[in-house]
């Protein structure tokens, strides 16, 4: 039995390393069966994923955003609704309220296609949802940051995705 488990771990590690090399991703293996992978993003600069090959499962975790400053229940509701649409991974919250993507896969299911699909799901969940999560949990901070940058003549280019948050709704008494 122990030999079969060791063989499954070794095979899973080989599959993971092959996928990471083929995808030309930046990664390191600080310990046998442990991988730290940097996934490039479009909204979030990058997402770091930890992959750990255990005796029976491959587990993965990736940090998404810190504990929301505001609208925590709205953020959590959005995460739970979004979990219904994800495959192989789900959002999780740690004891500090920070948000992660986590997943677990049985070692016999670790295939090149499966690992690629999991990494794609992590990227979609962490990077694809990044701006939405910022809007939901940090709208006030975004507004303050924008005002601070404008007052100092600094670039607001990386806040362009949030311009709709910066426009104040007009009052009914305002002339059009």
Region locations from a protein language model:
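Short, charged/polar, Gly/Pro-enriched secondary-structure boundary elements
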Residues: 43-47, 107-110
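Conserved short hydrophobic interaction patches
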Residues: 19-22, 78, 82-86, 118-132
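A short acidic-to-branched-hydrophobic micro-motif
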Residues: 47-66
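A generic structural motif
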Residues: 64-68, 105-114
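Short, internal acidic amphipathic alpha-helical interface segments
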Residues: 61-102
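Charge-rich, low-complexity N-terminal segments
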Residues: 1-46, 94
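A contiguous, mid-protein "functional segment" used to position or interact
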Residues: 108-149
């Amino acid at each position: 039995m122990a030999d079969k488990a060791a063989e499954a771990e070794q095979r899973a590690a080989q599959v993971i390393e092959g996928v990471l090399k083929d995808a030309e991703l930046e990664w390191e293996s600080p310990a046998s069966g442990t991988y730290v992978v940097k996934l490039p993003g479009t909204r979030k600069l990058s997402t770091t994923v930890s992959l750990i090959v255990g005796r029976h499962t491959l587990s993965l975790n990736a940090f998404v955003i810190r504990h929301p400053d505001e609208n925590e229940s709205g953020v959590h509701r959005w995460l739970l609704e979004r979990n219904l649409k994800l495959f192989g991974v789900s959002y999780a919250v740690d004891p500090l309220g920070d948000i992660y993507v986590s997943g677990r896969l049985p070692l016999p299911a670790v295939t090149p296609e499966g690992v690629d699909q999991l990494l794609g799901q992590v990227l979609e969940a962490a990077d694809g949802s990044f701006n939405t999560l910022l809007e939901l949990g940090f709208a006030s901070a975004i507004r303050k940051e924008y005002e601070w940058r404008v007052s100092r003549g600094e670039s607001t280019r990386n806040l362009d995705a949030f311009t709709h948050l910066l426009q104040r709704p007009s009052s009914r008494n305002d002339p059009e």
